[in-house]
Every structure is written in structure tokens, then in C-alpha cells.
Curated annotation (Swiss-Prot):
Protein name: Probable deoxyuridine 5'-triphosphate nucleotidohydrolase
Membrane-crossing segments per the record: none
Catalysis: reaction(s): dUTP + H2O = dUMP + diphosphate + H(+)
Enzyme Commission no: 3.6.1.23
CDD domains in the record: trimeric_dUTPase (cd07557)
Source organism phylogeny: Archaea, Methanobacteriati, Methanobacteriota, Stenosarchaea group, Methanomicrobia
UniProt-listed SUPFAM superfamilies: dUTPase-like (SSF51283)
GO BP term (any one): dUTP biosynthetic process
Function per UniProt: This enzyme is involved in nucleotide metabolism: it produces dUMP, the immediate precursor of thymidine nucleotides and it decreases the intracellular concentration of dUTP so that uracil cannot be incorporated into DNA.
Signal peptide (from-to): none
GO molecular function, one term: dCTP deaminase activity
Length: 171
């Protein structure tokens, strides 16, 4: 298992399907060891969710969109939010990804929570933004907020991700 470099990521972005679609500025978003994802939308989480073993009783709570100001900024009070990214990711069957918040978020008292990005996943993903700073946190639309780190798998998976979130938010 090896972490991909910017050179390898550039090649994969030019592949078919491309590793990353709908980038705001691909060259800016390519980092030495990963790809940065940008903020498309922020929502508040409304109500309780539920998770069980076989997903037969899974319930993802509703979410209410928040509006950016005319200047493109939004001030978020302390709390949790759902964020949706601009980019659509197409992960090949021989890669997986782990996401980390950009260090600037952490230095401002906020962070992102996300799951493993499986081989074969395609979609415009969602993550949880947690604002810990009691004074809140400001974000601008299209801000670079997360970095995806791609790893090669020792062997290609026989069957890639096929869960309910496949192709999410791509319409």
C-alpha cells in the first residue's frame, strides 16, 4: 500500500473516468500527497438518525440548506453541519482514500469527520463539519476544506463499493 503523489494524481485526473470531476481549479487543488475538495453546500442536521447492523432500519436525518451571503461567506455558530463538496470522485478498483481536514480548519477551531472512501465509489460526497470554536467559524463558498489521500491496494478489489451512497449528489 502506497500513498499516491501529485504526479500520479494528475495522470488519474486525465483517465476515463477521471479521478476528480467538477474541480474549481484542478492545479490549485492538487497537493503533493492528495487532492483538496471544495465547499459546495452547507446544511444543518435536523433530527435524530439511526444505524443498525444490516441497514434495514438505518435512518439518515433530514438536513436543511443554509444560504451563503451575497459576498459568498457564511458564519456558522458552534455546532455540527453537513457539507457537500463540489467535486465528484471516481475511485478506481485498485485505490482507496482517506480524508483529512485542511490544517487551516483545525487552527480555526473546526474539523471534518468522514468515513473511508472505498474502491469503486463514485459520487459527490458529504461529510460532517464540526465547529468547536465558541465564537463560530466563517466559510466562503468553494473554500478548500478537505484533502483526500489516495492509497494503492495490494490487489484490486473484485467488487467495489455498491452501497446506497453510490452516485450520491451527482444529479
Amino acid at each position: 500500500m502506497a500513498l499516491l503523489s501529485s504526479n500520479e494524481l494528475r495522470k488519474l485526473i486525465k483517465a476515463n473516468p477521471p479521478l476528480l470531476e467538477n474541480a474549481v481549479d484542478t492545479e490549485t487543488q492538487i497537493q503533493p500527497n492528495g487532492l483538496e475538495l471544495t465547499l459546495k453546500e452547507i446544511k444543518t442536521i435536523e433530527g435524530a438518525g439511526a444505524v443498525d447492523f444490516d441497514n434495514s432500519e438505518r435512518k439518515v436525518p433530514d438536513a436543511k440548506p443554509l444560504e451563503f451571503g451575497k459576498d459568498g461567506w457564511i458564519h456558522l455558530p458552534e455546532g455540527i453541519y453537513k457539507v457537500i463538496f463540489n467535486e465528484i470522485v471516481n475511485i478506481p478498483m485498485n485505490l482507496a482514500a482517506i480524508a483529512k481536514p485542511r490544517s487551516s480548519l483545525i487552527r480555526c477551531g473546526a474539523t471534518l469527520e468522514t468515513a473511508v472512501w472505498d474502491a469503486g465509489y463514485r459520487g459527490r460526497s458529504e461529510s460532517m463539519l464540526v465547529v468547536y470554536n465558541p465564537a463560530g467559524f466563517k466559510l466562503k463558498k468553494n473554500a478548500r476544506i478537505m484533502q483526500l489521500l489516495f492509497y494503492t491496494l495490494n490487489t484490486e478489489v473484485e467488487e467495489g463499493y455498491s452501497g446506497v451512497y453510490q452516485n450520491e449528489n451527482t444529479n
